[in-house]
A protein has these predicted regions:
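Short, acidic, metal-binding catalytic loop of nucleotide-sugar glycosyltransferases
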Residues: 21-39, 50
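Short beta-strand-to-loop acidic/aromatic patch adjacent to the donor-nucleotide binding site
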Residues: 108-120
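Active-site acidic Asp-centered loop
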Residues: 47, 115-118, 148
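Hydrophobic targeting segments
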Residues: 3-10, 26, 38-44
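Short beta-strand/loop segment that forms part of the nucleotide-sugar
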Residues: 36-51, 86-88
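Conserved catalytic core of nucleotide-sugar-dependent glycosyltransferases
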Residues: 122-224
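C-terminal catalytic/acceptor-binding lobe
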Residues: 196-289
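Active-site-proximal specificity loops/subdomain of glycosyltransferases
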Residues: 50-109
Length: 289
C-alpha cells in the first residue's frame, strides 16, 4: 500500500463482549497487506458516569485485562502494525473520541477510517481505499468515502444501500432476514457478499449522506475544517455530515455500492454487565452512550 491509514475505535467497557468480532474483521483486512501503513487506534473507556458495572458478575479490572488480551494479536501480525491503545477514565462519548481521532491523525496519515465496536470491516477495505486514494489524490484530495450498508428504514438511505440489499423490503422489527437492520450478521456471511465482487461499483453520492460506522475521510478534508463540532455529544455522524455540507459541500463522496460493511446495531451482547440492565429487549430504549 502506498497510502497511509489510521482506523480508530472507541470501546465502552460494556461492549467487551462484541469488540472481538470487530477486531477479527480488522485482522482479516490487514493479513494480506504488503506493508504496515495502517495505524490502529483504540480507546477503552472505563468511565461509569452513565452506566455502572454490576460487580456481582464482572469486575472492571478483569474487563480491562480481557480487552488488552483481545488487542494483543494485532500487535503480533507479521507486518507489526502500529497499534495504539489507551485506557480512559474520563467522561467521553463517541463524538468526543471521533473528534479527537480525526484531529489527532489528520497530520500523520492520508486517510482516516472510523471503526465501531458493532461493525465488521470488509477484508477488502484497505485494498480498495488505497486504490481509490492513489487514483483521486491529485484531482480531488479532499473527499469522503463509504461502503454499502443494509436495508434502511426510508428511501433517503437508498444511495448507500448495498446493491444486493436495496430492493429488499424494509420490515419493521425484523431480526430474521439477512438484509434487515436488526439482523446480526457474521464475518463469514459478510465475506460471501464481498468475495464474489469482480468489478467495483463506485458512485459519487450527492448530497453527502453517511452514518459513522466505517466512514472514510481524507486527511485533507479534515485539515480544511470538516470535523465534529465541540458542542456535539451524540449523533456525531449527523453533525459531521452537516459540517461537510457547510465547509466543503462540493467534495465527492465515493461510495462502494457492492462492498458490504456490517453494522450490527442490535447485537444481543452490545450492552453487557450493566447494573440493573439484565433484560434489554430493545437496545436503544436504554442506550445512554
Amino acid at each position: 500500500m502506498k497510502t497511509k491509514f489510521a482506523i480508530g475505535c472507541l470501546v465502552q467497557w460494556y461492549e467487551i463482549e462484541i469488540v472481538q468480532e470487530y477486531i477479527d474483521s480488522l485482522k482479516q483486512s490487514l493479513e494480506h497487506q504488503e506493508n504496515n501503513n495502517v495505524i490502529i487506534d483504540f480507546t477503552f473507556n472505563i468511565n461509569q458516569q452513565l452506566e455502572k458495572i454490576d460487580e456481582s458478575v464482572a469486575k472492571l479490572d478483569e474487563l480491562v485485562d480481557r480487552f488488552k488480551t483481545m488487542v494483543s494479536p494485532l500487535k503480533k501480525l507479521v507486518k507489526k502494525y502500529d497499534v495504539r491503545c489507551r485506557i480512559n477514565e474520563d467522561f467521553i462519548t463517541i463524538a468526543h473520541y471521533r473528534r479527537w481521532f480525526l484531529d489527532e491523525y489528520c497530520t500523520e496519515v492520508d486517510v482516516l477510517v472510523q471503526g465501531e465496536t458493532d461493525a465488521l470491516i470488509p477484508k477488502q477495505t484497505f485494498t480498495v481505499l488505497d486504490m481509490l486514494h492513489q487514483q483521486v489524490k491529485k484531482d480531488t484530495p479532499k473527499y469522503l468515502a463509504t461502503f454499502g450498508i443494509n436495508k434502511m428504514w426510508d428511501d433517503s438511505w437508498k444511495p448507500l444501500e448495498h446493491v444486493d440489499f436495496t430492493n429488499k423490503p424494509f420490515i419493521n422489527d425484523d431480526e430474521d432476514n439477512w438484509w434487515s437492520i436488526r439482523y446480526t450478521m457474521t464475518i463469514d456471511e459478510m465475506n460471501q457478499f464481498n468475495d464474489k465482487v469482480e468489478d467495483l461499483d463506485i458512485v459519487n453520492v450527492k448530497p453527502h449522506k453517511f452514518n459513522g460506522c466505517g466512514f472514510v475521510i481524507s486527511s485533507e478534508a479534515v485539515k480544511s475544517g470538516v470535523n465534529i463540532p465541540k458542542g456535539t455529544f451524540f449523533i456525531d455522524d449527523t453533525a459531521l455530515g452537516h459540517m461537510a455540507q457547510k465547509v466543503l459541500p462540493d467534495i465527492p463522496q465515493y461510495h462502494f455500492r457492492n462492498i458490504l460493511i456490517v453494522h450490527n446495531r442490535k447485537h444481543s451482547k452490545k450492552r453487557s454487565w450493566i447494573l440493573g440492565e439484565n433484560d434489554v429487549n430493545y437496545i436503544d430504549d436504554k442506550r445512554k452512550s
